[in-house]
Regions:
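Outer-membrane beta-barrel biogenesis signature
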Residues: 19-89, 190-194, 217
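Repeated loop/turn-to-beta-strand initiation elements of outer-membrane beta-barrel proteins
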Residues: 61, 123-126, 175-180, 236-239, ...
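Residues on the lipid-exposed face of transmembrane beta-strands in outer-membrane beta-barrel proteins
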Residues: 52-54, 65, 114-118, 128, ...
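Residues that define the transmembrane beta-barrel architecture of outer-membrane proteins
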Residues: 59, 108-112, 150, 158-164, ...
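Outer membrane beta-barrel transmembrane domains
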Residues: 76, 82-89, 93-94, 251-358
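Outer-membrane pore/translocation modules
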Residues: 131-244, 301
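Extracellular loop and loop/strand-boundary signature of outer-membrane beta-barrel proteins
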Residues: 49-51, 98-102, 148-156, 210-216, ...
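Transmembrane beta-strands of outer-membrane beta-barrel pores
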Residues: 67-73, 132-136, 172, 186-192, ...
């Protein structure tokens, strides 16, 4: 278990004390901020793939629903592509057979996220979200010896409520078209971590095994979420930056690795009701900590070390205002990937969502 980075806790706590002590003295700033909030435009929200990118004024609420699709294929070690035959030469760390015999071919992951925000004061916005995961992976099984011929193909699937999180956004600055806020939150992974599936064995028969880590709905862990977000508006343009982290605070046998993320984006109005966006996202994820002794199939995804790495994605999106609410769409693709491998790389991703404020 990793230690929590208390720098974030101190930052947000001090921000909370400062902003609350200034609330009664900051009416001029508040009125100025309300003036800017009243200038509704499609770029009021960041790209739909961002979370916690904006705060609300006192008494305002928002509900949202988002759908995300991500596809993965082609195995990598580091930033280099590797073939099935390359992977079949790797040792099986869990005994027999001596070499890996099952190789992932592609994977689809679908997520549905239900969210809500509410601002009890002008300086604090509360945010919560529940996430449902749907995963499907195609794999190929090879003979364990001799020519290593293909035995056959098979598919594993899983779905469940994955996680629930709750955060508070603390407004630090809101003036002259500049906005700056901090986020501190808690996330609980609630899905099952010991789901089983039918796996094609090297000898040609099917057996029921605990699915590898990447196919589980969650790791049953708890994490601390933190972020800092800054945006600046120049007439029809808007620039933004966000740094965020997710740090494991408690887990059972194992947990997915800690992550750090940097987002930089630009938005521009297309007309009075729509705006396009361009976003760069860099993410670093550590490998899995711990292990489940029942996950021991002769496949790369059964090894906790074959998770995590660094990715740089480029996304392009659009936000459109509706008579009630707004919709967003963003498609993204990796520019570079350096993965703890072997593991499958992301091919492309798509996210769509709807917001309604009241």
């Amino acid at each position: 278990m990793r230690k929590i980075n208390f720098t974030w806790l101190l930052l947000v706590a001090s921000t909370f004390i400062f902003t609350n002590s200034m609330e009664d003295m900051g009416h001029d700033m508040h009125d100025h901020g309300m003036h800017h909030h009243s200038k509704h435009s499609a770029k009021m929200h960041g790209p739909i793939g961002l979370m916690g990118d904006h705060f609300h004024r006192k008494g305002e609420s928002m509900v949202s629903i988002r759908y995300m699709k991500m596809t993965m294929d082609q195995n990598y070690i580091g930033s280099n592509k590797v073939s099935d035959q390359d992977i079949l030469q790797l040792a099986n760390p869990y005994g027999m057979p001596e070499k890996l015999t099952v190789v992932p071919q592609d994977m689809d992951m679908d997520m549905v996220m239900l969210g809500a925000m509410y601002a009890p004061t002008n300086f604090i916005t509360l945010m919560t979200m529940a996430t449902f995961n749907f995963k499907s992976m195609d794999l190929k099984t090879y003979q364990p010896m001799m020519e290593r011929d293909v035995v056959g193909d098979f598919t594993t699937k899983s779905s469940d409520l994955s996680r629930f999180n709750f955060s508070a956004l603390f407004k630090i600055y809101d003036r002259d078209e500049s906005k700056f806020h901090a986020q501190l939150g808690f996330e609980r992974n609630m899905g099952k971590s010991d789901l089983k599936g039918q796996v094609l064995m090297p000898m040609g028969s099917f057996g029921s095994l605990v699915l590898p880590y990447g196919m589980q709905s969650s790791d049953r862990s708890s994490s601390i979420l933190s972020a800092l977000t800054y945006t600046k508006t120049y007439d029809e343009w808007k620039l933004g930056g966000q740094i965020k982290s997710k740090i494991n605070a408690e887990s059972d046998e194992w947990n997915f690795g800690d992550s750090n993320e940097l987002n930089l984006w630009v938005q521009r109005d297309l007309n009075k009701i729509s705006a396009w966006s361009l976003r760069l996202k860099h993410q670093h994820i550590e490998s899995i900590e711990g292990l489940n002794k029942n996950i021991k199939a002769p496949v790369q995804t059964a090894n906790p070390l074959n998770y995590g790495g660094q990715t740089l994605n480029l996304g392009i999106g659009i936000n459109i205002m509706l008579p009630k609410g707004s919709i967003g769409l963003e498609a993204y693709k990796p520019i570079s990937q350096d993965l703890n491998g072997p593991q499958m790389a992301m091919n492309w991703g798509l996210q769509a969502g709807y917001h309604l404020s009241f």
